[in-house]
């Protein structure tokens, strides 16, 4: 039986180490669910949290920092509210995920659009989690 979802977003659930970020972008798989481009990597190396994430918004798309911060806040909030869609599967199969979300839209998206894209992307990643733990990575 899985525990009830926790809706916090702690530091252990954020991807911030340069080596881990390079590994995600170097070895990860990518897909687009508009307005998000998602790059993720699944692994069996033990971490504190089953999934860790980062959000990136290009300065080229949103020149003003206020808008970039708003979009990042929307993506983080959508992830925080829907991460249980992925974490339940990861916890059951003892797999760990690192995920990068990049905004590809040129216009400021609303929360409903971001949340739908987040749900679709987390369900898609959960569908790609292997049934047995990855032993040789």
Swiss-Prot record:
Top EC class for this record: hydrolase
Domain of life where this protein originates: Bacteria
Pfam family, one: Ribonuclease_P
GO biological process: tRNA 5'-leader removal
One Gene Ontology cellular component: ribonuclease P complex
Function according to Swiss-Prot or TrEMBL: RNaseP catalyzes the removal of the 5'-leader sequence from pre-tRNA to produce the mature 5'-terminus. It can also cleave other RNA substrates such as 4.5S RNA. The protein component plays an auxiliary but essential role in vivo by binding to the 5'-leader sequence and broadening the substrate specificity of the ribozyme.
NCBIfam families in the record: rnpA
PANTHER family documented for this protein: RIBONUCLEASE P PROTEIN COMPONENT
Protein name stated in the entry: Ribonuclease P protein component
């Amino acid at each position: 039986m899985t525990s009830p979802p926790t809706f916090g977003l702690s530091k252990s659930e954020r991807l911030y180490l340069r080596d881990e970020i390079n590994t995600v972008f170097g070895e990860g798989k990518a897909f687009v669910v508009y307005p998000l481009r998602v790059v993720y990597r699944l692994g069996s190396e033990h971490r504190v949290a089953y999934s860790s994430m980062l959000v990136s918004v290009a300065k080229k798309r949103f020149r003003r920092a206020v808008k970039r911060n708003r979009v990042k806040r929307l993506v983080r909030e959508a992830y925080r509210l829907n991460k249980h869609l992925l974490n339940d599967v990861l916890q059951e199969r003892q797999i760990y995920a690192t995920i990068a979300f990049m905004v590809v839209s040129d216009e400021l998206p609303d929360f409903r659009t971001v949340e739908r894209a987040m749900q679709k992307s987390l369900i898609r990643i959960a569908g790609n989690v292997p049934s047995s733990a990855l032993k040789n990575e």
